[in-house]
Amino acid sequence: MARVYSNWDRLVRATLRREQLRNTGQGHERVSSGLAGAVPPSLGRATNIDAILQAADEIQSEDPSVARILCEQAYSMAQNLDPNSDGRGVLQFKTGLMSVIKQKLAKRDGASIDRDRDIERLWEFYKLYKRRHRVDDIQKEEQKWRESGTTFSSNVGEILKMRKVFATLRALIEVLEVLSRDADPNGVGRSIRDELGRIKKADATLSAELTPYNIVPLEAQSMTNAIGVFPEVRGAVQAIRYTEHFPRLPVDFEISGQRDADMFDLLEYIFGFQRDNVRNQREHLVLTLSNAQSQLSIPGQNDPKIDENAVNEVFLKVLDNYIKWCKYLRIRVVYNKLEAIDRDRKLFLVSLYFLIWGEAANVRFLPECICYIFHNMAKELDAKLDHGEAVRADSCLTGTDTGSVSFLERIICPIYETISAETVRNNGGKAAHSEWRNYDDFNEYFWTPACFELSWPMKTESRFLSKPKGRKRTAKSSFVEHRTYLHLFRSFIRLWIFMFIMFQSLTIIAFRNEHLNIETFKILLSAGPTYAIMNFIECLLDVVLMYGAYSMARGMAISRLVIRFLWWGLGSAFVVYYYVKVLDERNKPNQNEFFFHLYILVLGCYAAVRLIFGLLVKLPACHALSEMSDQSFFQFFKWIYQERYFVGRGLFENLSDYCRYVAFWLVVLASKFTFAYFLQIKPLVKPTNTIIHLPPFQYSWHDIVSKSNDHALTIVSLWAPVLAIYLMDIHIWYTLLSAIIGGVMGAKARLGEIRTIEMVHKRFESFPEAFAQNLVSPVVKRVPLGQHASQDGQDMNKAYAAMFSPFWNEIIKSLREEDYLSNREMDLLSIPSNTGSLRLVQWPLFLLCSKILVAIDLAMECKETQEVLWRQICDDEYMAYAVQECYYSVEKILNSMVNDEGRRWVERIFLEISNSIEQGSLAITLNLKKLQLVVSRFTALTGLLIRNETPDLAKGAAKAMFDFYEVVTHDLLSHDLREQLDTWNILARARNEGRLFSRIAWPRDPEIIEQVKRLHLLLTVKDAAANVPKNLEARRRLEFFTNSLFMDMPQARPVAEMVPFSVFTPYYSETVLYSSSELRSENEDGISILFYLQKIFPDEWENFLERIGRSESTGDADLQASSTDALELRFWVSYRGQTLARTVRGMMYYRRALMLQSFLERRGLGVDDASLTNMPRGFESSIEARAQADLKFTYVVSCQIYGQQKQQKKPEATDIGLLLQRYEALRVAFIHSEDVGNGDGGSGGKKEFYSKLVKADIHGKDEEIYSIKLPGDPKLGEGKPENQNHAIVFTRGEAIQTIDMNQDNYLEEAIKMRNLLEEFHGKHGIRRPTILGVREHVFTGSVSSLAWFMSNQETSFVTLGQRVLAYPLKVRMHYGHPDVFDRIFHITRGGISKASRVINISEDIYAGFNSTLRQGNITHHEYIQVGKGRDVGLNQIALFEGKVAGGNGEQVLSRDVYRIGQLFDFFRMMSFYFTTVGFYVCTMMTVLTVYVFLYGRVYLAFSGADRAISRVAKLSGNTALDAALNAQFLVQIGIFTAVPMVMGFILELGLLKAIFSFITMQFQLCSVFFTFSLGTRTHYFGRTILHGGAKYRATGRGFVVQHIKFADNYRLYSRSHFVKAFEVALLLIIYIAYGYTDGGASSFVLLTISSWFLVISWLFAPYIFNPSGFEWQKTVEDFEDWVSWLMYKGGVGVKGELSWESWWEEEQAHIQTLRGRILETILSLRFFMFQYGIVYKLDLTRKNTSLALYGYSWVVLVVIVFLFKLFWYSPRKSSNILLALRFLQGVASITFIALIVVAIAMTDLSIPDMFACVLGFIPTGWALLSLAITWKQVLRVLGLWETVREFGRIYDAAMGMLIFSPIALLSWFPFISTFQSRLLFNQAFSRGLEISIILAGNRANVET
């Protein structure tokens, strides 16, 4: 039985430890040991069981009996909490805990236990533990430090030990308190309770150290956190403290923690804010105030005060949007004047705003709603503050008898519930936008005075809070996002009017043969009616597209619509009428031209008035004047001219910026219209006139339109492609000019000056000074430079180097930690501190390597004078540095080693050498040919000194020193000097007695140790360091960092005075860390992630093994054997993927940089701990440096479902916990949900949601800091914005950088963050920046060609593209995640993204729109960069581009784009259009040009018009058509996409490398890739606008080198590319077959080469760029898989990946609405043209053009369909029916074949006719299939759906076979696969990587 009991105990312990190991990431870090790590969540939340068990583990070795007492108490607490063990894991925990207790009892060897004495034993141990750890002394010292106003003098390691001691003491006190209740009340129990009472009063330190806090310990003072004693923080705390004139709080109101009451307590009592919200915003305000104060000045230590200016700055910035809102609505703010309210009132208002915002949840997306709430609550507060006693607010009373208040329940919940009810109508994103109110609709309700109808408290029956009932929709506010392309016309009406009028004018001039006379002028005046009619169309669209908002829209807005509609309706009629009269006058001779003059007068007056208003409203210089005018007449016309919104006012720039972007566009437009006139319009004039005057001819088919209308369709087919290119090619000119401007600006900004590691070597000498000028704060520069101000430049350079060295070395260390460098490279790259007594600058060894040896060779070969030798050495300046350093270092080292006679010898030697140098007789004094021997003896000495001292080494060093002495004396010195030394009595006596150099002083001084090691390397490293570092990434980073030192950037301020900021990363469920199993799990080719990375990054793998102390032969099993090494391996792999771990590491470099900067600043000022100054990593141990960094930097990762992941024990939760342990400053916010009772005591009912913030405690477990209840599920929109929104309340500072979880950062870039933040105070136009754009480096482009294309394309946009957008165009928005936001500006204006479902799918760009509309300013800066990962496989890239294109499709419908398009001035509007949605419109136009051209050509071929007119009109060689097609082709293949790319290459790589890179890209088929991407963007953009369906597409960010199956590619690209490519191919075939040209088929091919290229790219790009796409074995497997998928029957629950039927149904899901069905029907009608045209081209029909022929073709088609159905039909019942069916099928087939044979033999039907019929019937069948899919419900009712589905299967099978056949054919030839591998992975081959091993797979290696 004992054995069973023992085994059970072992099993339970092992299970608990394994569970704990899994929950702590199978690694080290700070892990909760023992049972404390296995406490179930249900027990841990309610008690301190885990803390008690942790204390038991801590003291187990000191006193097992006390540990047993603690365990027993923990068991009792668990039993009391959950007696039935109902909670998850509780039973296992209790069993394990009881097992531990029994083991502890068993170890007592049978000794009895007197439990009555447990409390006494515990009490004695408590006192002993306090004495042992000097707790009382520590508390006394802490009190002294606090009284002196400084922090406790201790480093981080000691602080952690102290906190653990305090935690243990607190657990002991808690157990003592519980046990004392059961003790003898008259005995020891009473005395202990009395003692405990005294302890709890006096021992505030215990609770202070263990009270959870975020950054500042406000609840209780902490001795381990220095932030609380910073004077600015103390001043801020003092500023909000409760004063006598505040209303008195009730006596029973509980003040949390050990602090004094403050104004937040009063606000909590009055309005019922949540306690944790109050705690959170209290810290928020304290940090905001303290940072505002620090930027003005640091207060004094004694009684610090916050300056009034700091309070005013915070007040005005926080309430800026509220003040503007009041001004817009013409209501009075809650205070009279700023000067009239005192400081406390200001802080009360700011505190109130923060508290409202902090608890508003989803209502934070409604900034003006928050203004409304604040306005009313501030008025309530104002009244309450006048009372002597605090009184609760009526608006927040919950209605219960207790008189309790709840802001959340009374104010936020009603609004949230209304929003939530509206989102239900969204139907998961499928409903039309017009069917429901989104966030913008709710917010814009508060843009009108009607919002005050809500009253206060808000009326629940108001229209605003009305919830949708049934199918009745609630009205929108002021804009309705109807799904239509017409939004493009409406939003950018001025652009389209301008383009069409210019086209009309140029066409008129061309047709008038450029005769600019009065007649031409009269015709040009036709632009007047065009202008009026287009404006009338806009007004008509305004009226139509406002449908759905009339009942809620402002009356003024509707009035403006009506007025404009009537104005333009009557105006267009008037202008058209008068212009017709002008034309009548023109045609009648002898007219007085009355109407012409009147017409001119009307147009002139209108143009003048319009110009004046345009100047006043849009021109920067006149805008202020128009704003000041209060004339009602003027304001009326201004209102008619431009709608007035709360946003979008003041969208103008200063005059200089305005002139710049106007000049830019004038150049673009001049180029565009010159090209359009001479190469597009003018060449078409003659052919058009020829066609119009062409005599009638016989059409080949039954013509309906052209014959009687001057060949109208022929002219349309001629002009349509040219018009399409005309509308698109302005983007080409924009791209060209922006590339040129961007390149010039980049060169001016000094980008690319240092582009190779050789240039880093050459210019290294200038780096320290540049670094000191830009990146060192003036405070630090003043101290060292002041000391050397009177000295020479050498001392200045040394001072600069001393500033530079700690930063450079830390950068090098970070590169080593990231395994980009080896240990040797780190030593070579490190720079000495330059703070020693050496008289010259010491440079890194990689600059000096082998220089000494070369100098020795020069000296040994020198036959000239000393001056000549020195000149030769100085030709290489670093050689001169090396020689000088070697000389002075040898002198210093020798003097430090020897004494007495030895020192005298050293001094004499160096004195003689110095004298010789001064006299120029060095070559006489020394025998330079012996230098090599001398150096060899000295390196022997230093080789010993660099090791740790031992007796043997000491003897060896003494001998080596003597050998050195002998060589110097007898070989190096001249004969005369040698004789002098030999006869020197003191020296001779010591030598003879054996005392000379008998004792060597081993180096102890850190400076000497550093010099010895450095000198040894300097003398022994023989190979040149030109290739140091050899890692390409390390080179790139060092090149960019050193280059950025010479770029313009603001001056860095001291850390204490810098702008504080937060970094914010949203995370859902992506990879955090790769698990050990994921590292080794193999794909179908036997490739694991670890194997892949070892081959791709071989040098980094070797560096990693070196770092962890392993040899290169170490295997995976060896690494797994060590938990530490296994964890390091997981991190190493994760840091090379797109993981959260990589992002967190990168962002935490900010803290490391700030700690280093703060530490060095404090050390420079002499205020830091002297004991840490000489520590290698002293800044990391400095408590003050850490506190200063935490005051200025916060990092919050918003892990939306972290709570669920923890409950489900997902590995992601474990890994996030591991990151929390590794980075103490990391904070994780997440949404926690709890099931609450339904009111009758049962479980279930509804859920409550909480926004929580956690950090790691001292034991590595999650410690909850804040828990704020939400009104409901926050995910009402897109998800990601709400994830950001719930967590943004936990951010701090004045700036916030948004970082996605696929990004990275680097220490050298983090050092420049202070400079970047100063840009917020810089001058960038008339407004200060609100978003700082940051350059990105795409780190995923290093291996495959696709990744390289994508990274180059992305890099060109995020550098050159955004450079031009920000300046001079002033239209940069927020495109990605490294941008830095003005935090206060944005959190008071709706946040950093928008969240409405579907319409805000591209949520981040709306932050830029919102910032711009609210008078923000967005800049771009390139001296700092952030790493970014991108998708690397074609499928991932296609999904990503589809997501972005779909998002742009939704933007077309959005109100933000509409308002920017309407409110920007004309030129800025064009910049905005062509850089946002216009880019996708032009992309779509490129594809449409192909369609328009080919359909036009096919029309000409079918109709016979081409043959009739080709000789006279010469269409095939027409200049305009050629120009149009050439422009289309160049856009299609990505030439203009590559232009900015090439310019970026030239700028940053150099001209030759740029040319080589561009040619390489072409050889790697980048044009195929860009053409394919063109189709992706066109498909998703167009389909989104037509049908919607834009959604977030998870692209996956793994390592992609695996083969994608044929079926996977077919599913993804079938409808977006393949169908369209086959349509274009069919058009081309028909064009070749029936078109007419003198040159034959070859001319057709040449004319349509771009179209053929498009077909091939769209059909085969997925397979060309598919790894192993042409390997025969994989081709066979792909075919089998595809056939299996195609024939697999679908059903309920069967996914599209498994069955063609399921996939086919999914592909039709986007067709939802009647409008969509009608549009699809219209688009499908084009396919009927093929059959209609081919029928009349058959030999059978000859020249018959009767319409009946087309009818007969339909009869044939019906017969074919019937036969198909007959052959496809398969009965499932009787075998007799089956036999009859087979007989019928046989007869039918024979009959059909016989009829065809007879028809061919007896009629004119030919074999080519048969193929022609196939060409005609295939598109008709596709049209019928498309129509059937569109009207699916009708077909289902008719019972034809099964037949339709089988037709669909046949079409997909046929398309698949046509694509697959060439692939199968090419797979026969092995060299094709080899060529493809080189094509795809050229980057890897050029780096010498073993990519072939990866592609071949690792199966063979595994099997053998």
From Swiss-Prot:
Any GO BP: developmental growth
Protein topology in the membrane: Multi-pass membrane protein
Enzyme Commission number: 2.4.1.34
Catalytic reaction list: [(1->3)-beta-D-glucosyl](n) + UDP-alpha-D-glucose = [(1->3)-beta-D-glucosyl](n+1) + UDP + H(+)
TM segment ranges: 491-511, 532-552, 562-582, 594-614, 661-681, 722-742, 1474-1494, 1529-1549, 1554-1574, 1621-1641, 1644-1664, 1747-1767, 1783-1803, 1811-1831, 1853-1873
Keywords linked to the UniProt accession: Cell membrane, Cell shape, Cell wall biogenesis/degradation, Glycosyltransferase, Leucine-rich repeat, Membrane, Repeat, Transferase, Transmembrane, Transmembrane helix
Signal peptide residues on this chain, from the entry's feature table: none
InterPro entries registered for this protein in UniProt: FKS1-like_dom1, Glyco_trans_48_dom
One protein family per Pfam: FKS1_dom1
An annotated Gene Ontology molecular function: 1,3-beta-D-glucan synthase activity
Sequence ranges of the LRR repeats: 678-701, 751-774, 925-948, 1159-1181
Effects seen without this gene: Seedling lethality with severe dwarfism. Plants develop collapsed and inviable pollen grains.
Similarity-based family: Belongs to the glycosyltransferase 48 family.
Protein name: Callose synthase 10
